[in-house]
Amino acid sequence: MQFLNMFFFDIYPYIAGAVFLIGSWLRYDYGQYTWRAASSQMLDRKGMNLASNLFHIGILGIFVGHFFGMLTPHWMYEAWLPIEVKQKMAMFAGGASGVLCLIGGVLLLKRRLFSPRVRATTTGADILILSLLVIQCALGLLTIPFSAQHMDGSEMMKLVGWAQSVVTFHGGASQHLDGVAFIFRLHLVLGMTLFLLFPFSRLIHIWSVPVEYLTRKYQLVRARH
């Protein structure tokens, strides 16, 4: 048990991270034709907008919340944001984003499996990744009742300590998870596994998000007379 704990929370994060970065780079260099979202909207528009919007809004909220919530050093906000308040914000905002993502993910998965035209262009990797994302989202929602048992933020700070130890390459990161509920550990392992699978799936299109679109100049479109 001690070996598994050390492997999954001291070693596995770096395996997943290395595959995530190196795999993405190699795919960009050698597989640019596959570097796409492979949208299926033209094949079946029914319910696509609702499902896609719910899923993407939810997952964006989850990503932003996890990124800043887990990786922001405590000293940067302790003077104006008590840990108990941060815990409540994480539970409510994360819960709302999780519900949106879960509903959208289930609708997208249903469409992938039961729409004949979409199913014909769907790969096993598509179904696997979307299924894992739905499961991961459900696991995240299931952690909320466990978080509610530690409203002082102690459980959350253990997870924060682990994440910050990993990204700053401090040894013994797994020690921060002593006493943490199994549901959190499962959530962490599946999350790292998604990073491991990232370069081999259509998730790769996230790297090409058109951020510059937000700041580009307006385009003038003139009618021909």
Curated annotation (Swiss-Prot):
Main location: membrane
Membrane-spanning ranges: 4-29, 48-70, 83-112, 125-148, 183-198
Record text on cofactor binding: Binds 2 heme groups per subunit. Heme 1, called the proximal or heme Bp in PubMed:12910261, is located at the cytoplasmic interface, heme 2, called the distal or heme Bd, is located at the periplasmic interface. Electrons are transferred from the periplasmic to the cytoplasmic heme. Heme may be transferred to this protein by HemW.
Positions of disulphide bridges: none
Segments on the Periplasmic side according to the record's topology features: 1-3, 71-82, 149-182
Single Gene Ontology MF annotation: metal ion binding
Subcellular location: Cell inner membrane
Leader sequence segment: none
Requisite cofactors: heme
Entry's induction text: By nitrate.
Key words of the record: Cell inner membrane, Cell membrane, Electron transport, Formylation, Heme, Iron, Membrane, Metal-binding, Nitrate assimilation, Oxidoreductase, Transmembrane, Transmembrane helix, Transport
Stored SUPFAM superfamilies: Respiratory nitrate reductase 1 gamma chain
Coiled coil: none
Keyword Cell wall biogenesis/degradation: no
The protein's role, per its UniProt record: The nitrate reductase enzyme complex allows E.coli to use nitrate as an electron acceptor during anaerobic growth. The gamma chain is a membrane-embedded heme-iron unit resembling cytochrome b, which transfers electrons from quinones to the beta subunit.
Protein name, UniProt field: Respiratory nitrate reductase 1 gamma chain
Annotated organism of origin: Escherichia coli (strain K12)
Gene that encodes the chain: narI
